Amino acid sequence: MAPRPLGPLVLALGGAAAVLGSVLFILWKTYFGRGRERRWDRGEAWWGAEAARLPEWDEWDPEDEEDEEPALEELEQREVLVLGLDGAGKSTFLRVLSGKPPLEGHIPTWGFNSVRLPTKDFEVDLLEIGGSQNLRFYWKEFVSEVDVLVFVVDSADRLRLPWARQELHKLLDKDPDLPVVVVANKQDLSEAMSMGELQRELGLQAIDNQREVFLLAASIAPAGPTFEEPGTVHIWKLLLELLS
């Protein structure tokens, strides 16, 4: 099929995306960019660690703040980049990690979302960049600034899986040392591909076995306010191990 000619609206959107990409990169460099130090010991199995749960959140009371001692030092920060095609479930993944219930329907991210999650030893900053075609061009600019990449894939979207594979391998090639967690999302759907099929179709079996690439299942679907999906807890546990 011959490529369609670009109309004025498409050109305008492309220019806006270019500006947005530049702004995103500046924001990232200003607030999160600090380079990356390797922390993952390949001799330690992440699945053997103590069971982890999603972060718990308490109501903030201004009266409590007056009685608290000032912090002696700030917690170190760890950066996680969350990418994937539009509609894969990146925003829902961030909501679930932050203790919020998933939203009904699909609301695309026009720009980025960010979440900061506290742990005992450090704070985890997760940045999601939208998965529209115009924004994918800028993904590679961010991978060298983070500690871990999370790549979310819609397990039921067979039609666009080749595009997901292409974008994933671009990122893998950009930084051979970056740990990558591939989230096989929407495994609860009847049409979802199996983990074995996804591993083949995403070309993960061809990756050097010395590379830190993990494929984990998730079923991040709308549910009640007490929703806590086991797959997401498993992913959070792995992230803590990779970031420690």
From Swiss-Prot:
Source organism superkingdom: Eukaryota
Residues engaged in binding GTP: 84-91, 128-132, 185-188
UniProt xrefs under Gene3D superfamilies: P-loop containing nucleotide triphosphate hydrolases
GO cellular component assignments: mitochondrion
UniProt-recorded Gene Ontology molecular function terms: GTP binding; GTPase activity
Keywords on record: GTP-binding, Nucleotide-binding
Recorded family membership: Belongs to the small GTPase superfamily. Arf family.
Name listed for the protein in its UniProt record: ADP-ribosylation factor-like protein 10
UniProt source species: Homo sapiens
Gene that encodes the chain: ARL10
